[in-house]
Amino acid sequence: MNSTPMHLLRLLLFLAMLPLAACNDPRSNSLSRLRHADAAGLRAEVAQLTVKLLPPAGPELVPIQPELWPVGLLKLRPLRLNLYRDGLAVSLQAAPGFEYGLHIVAAGADAQLKSTERTRYEKLQDGIYYFTQKR
């Protein structure tokens, strides 16, 4: 009996499933969204949000309401945006006990993010980091 058609069918099925598997990986998902965005524009929007919403002597964290989300950041399809002194956390995916996304440093700022016990950062490009955070 010839098994070549069965191997071909399995190969085709495997290739068809690859994009779906990548969508479930939070890092791949975040990178895909970033590839379709203007990184410099995102950093400029974060700088504007920082000036507008984060006073120098105010809180360390400002959750940003959806009606205030800039157009460029909306294109990332975020779950939530939290503005910190070192940039904007753009949560893109959540799972039980974890949150994943991009941390964008404001244009003109040179913050170097360091991982902590709760949050792990990976630099993707100047001013943009991938993060995994325990909730």
Regions flagged by a language model, labelled:
Residues 1-21:
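Sec-dependent bacterial lipoprotein signal peptides
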Residues 4, 21-22, 35, 83:
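Intrinsic disorder/low-complexity signature
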Residues 9, 28, 32, 114-115:
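Residue-level detector of functional hotspots within protein domains
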Residues 23-78:
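N-terminal export/targeting and maturation segments
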Residues 63-125, 131-135:
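Short, solvent-exposed recognition patches
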